[in-house]
Regions:
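Glycine-rich phosphate/ribose-binding loops and adjacent secondary-structure elements
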Residues: 160
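Aromatic-lined, polymer-binding surfaces characteristic
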Residues: 1-156, 164-191
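Catalytic-core region of carbohydrate-active enzymes that cleave or remodel glycosidic bonds
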Residues: 199-208
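Loop/turn-rich, solvent-exposed surfaces of beta-rich toroidal or solenoidal domains
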Residues: 193-196
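Conserved small/polar residues in nucleotide/adenosyl-binding loops
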Residues: 209-213
Length: 213
């Protein structure tokens, strides 16, 4: 919590960059997702000033135009977090991301990362986890239907099946596609399905404990 406070304290040497280049949008998206997933541990204990500084910082990122691929979800999940905490929201960023990701579904649990399909781990790094988390909030706010949320979850479950089958008996997995060095996120959809306790019946949670982390 002290680190989070320092992250938006102008006088702290640990103050995060929210103003230079596009990268802060990516970083802020994962931070916003963490706030969504663990509000009682990470968001609610923060003091009022720190919360307001994060809200201001997140809103300042609206100036950045996202790349036309999975990056649409970065802006969308930031706005979704703002919606969750009762702030004014740029709905267009949320709806555009959801619309395009849905259009880019190619079947069998896989989304295309933009108009052209790329065989890589971005379905795990970004697409499934963020889309499901976004739909969870939109469902709570009655902006999307239960059916839309459930469809996204079912697709993530199907993708987790592919992910589990790529893990070798010794815990290694094939490195392919761009950003293969982001190995800690290579099975995020699989771990999220395990966390939600909706793994396919033939995948036992204990089998995942020895998977790469």
């Amino acid at each position: 919590l002290k680190g989070l406070k320092n992250g938006v304290s102008p006088e702290s040497p640990d103050c995060l960059n929210f103003t230079r280049n596009y990268q802060p949008t990516v970083d802020a998206a994962y931070l916003a997702q963490a706030f969504l997933r663990a509000p009682k541990a990470l968001w609610e204990p923060l003091d009022t000033l720190t919360k307001q500084r994060y809200v201001t910082a997140f809103k300042s990122l609206r100036r950045n135009k996202p790349v036309y691929n999975n990056h649409l979800l970065f802006a969308a999940i930031i706005e979704t977090f703002l919606l969750k905490v009762g702030e004014q929201v740029d709905q267009a960023k949320v709806f555009l991301a959801c619309k395009k990701i849905e259009e880019w579904y190619v079947g069998d649990g896989w989304y295309s990362d933009g108009p052209s399909f790329s065989m890589d781990y971005y379905n795990d790094y970004v697409i499934h986890p963020m889309l499901v988390d976004i739909y969870q909030v939109l469902k709570e706010k009655k902006i999307v239907s239960e059916r839309q949320y459930n469809t996204a979850v079912k697709r993530m479950i199907r993708h987790s099946d592919f992910s589990e089958r790529m893990i070798m008996p010794d815990g290694v997995f094939p490195a392919f596609g761009r950003s293969a060095t982001y190995r800690t996120g290579a099975f995020q959809s699989l771990s999220q399905v395990a966390l939600m306790k909706i793994l396919p019946s033939y995948i036992h949670p204990c089998l995942l404990y020895t998977s790469p982390s």
